[in-house]
Every structure is written in structure tokens, then in C-alpha cells.
Amino acid sequence: LKSETGEDGRIRFWGHDAEGAEMAADRMRSLHLSNDETDRVKRVIGNHMRIHSMTNRFLDERKQPSRRAIYRFFRDTREAGVDLVLLSLADLRATYEHTLPESLWKAELDVCRILLENLWEHPAEVVKPPSFLNGHEVMQAFELSPSPLVGALLEAIREAQAMGDVSDKDEALVFASNWLKKEN
């Protein structure tokens, strides 16, 4: 791993999240743990810096995590999202021990609160919006053949729903038409 010492004296290991996730997955496979267990641990380790990044943006730019960021966080972490919230808090405490700035701790708590509020209070709006269209409807409406493009379009529609830009089937069709024009 490549390391770097910052101006603040802290040592950073670039890429440790991805490399650590692969190392853990290899170890879990050698122990014959299930694919589900391996996938969950891999997601936790591979994504453990994301909340810290959201917190840094919150501190630096005074921007709370966007609906898009929240949607993508839970899309990518799946059932491990809550695990990551707890891990990020423990990781921050362990990193700073007794020198943790109160402003950083409060910001990390705020980001974690925002993530959990959206997961538990607004799941259908932000975290996992219901599908207004399925692949067959998209292929029929736009005369498409089965392809990765159909899946990418469905994902783009869901993300637009999570952002509040699409709120029904008609809006999903308009969004899809515009998206396809941009892609072609």
C-alpha cells in the first residue's frame, strides 16, 4: 500500500479500503464462509471510507449528503449500510483516540443520522424507490432489444426517483426518453 504523511502528521494509506476488502474476501473464502457473509464483509471494508468522505464534505463545504449520495450509498452497500454507519463511528474514535475534534465528531454523527433517517423514515422516497417501469416496458416503449443499456436506463430512472426528479410512470417515461437521447 502506498502511504503518505499529511501536513497534520497523520499517515494515510491510499487504496487500503479496496485492497483490504479483497484480502478479507480471500481469507473468508479460505475459511469456507458463505458467499453472502463474504459479500457483506467485502462491502463493509470496501466502503468504510465513504461516510468519512461525506463528513469531510459536510465540514469543508457545509453540504449535507445529497439524496443522490444517500441513494448510491445504500445501493452500493445494500444490507451492510447500517453496519457501515456503526463502523464509521468506531473507526473515527479509534483513529483519533483522545484527540478527536468535537466538530468532526458532531459532523460524523450528523451524517450518520441523515443516512439512518433516510433508511428508516424515507426508504421509498430516497433509499429504495419503487420501480415505475420494468425492463419489458422500457424495451417496448423505446423499441430496444435486451441489453445492458436497458439495465442502465432502469438504474438511471431509480436514481432520478431518489433525487425527487421522477414521481410517477409518465415522468419516468419522459426521463427515459431524454436519457436515451443523451446516451445516443
Model-derived regions: residue spans:
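C-terminal subdomains that position terminal phosphate/3'-OH groups for nucleotidyl transfer/ligation
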Residues: 1-184
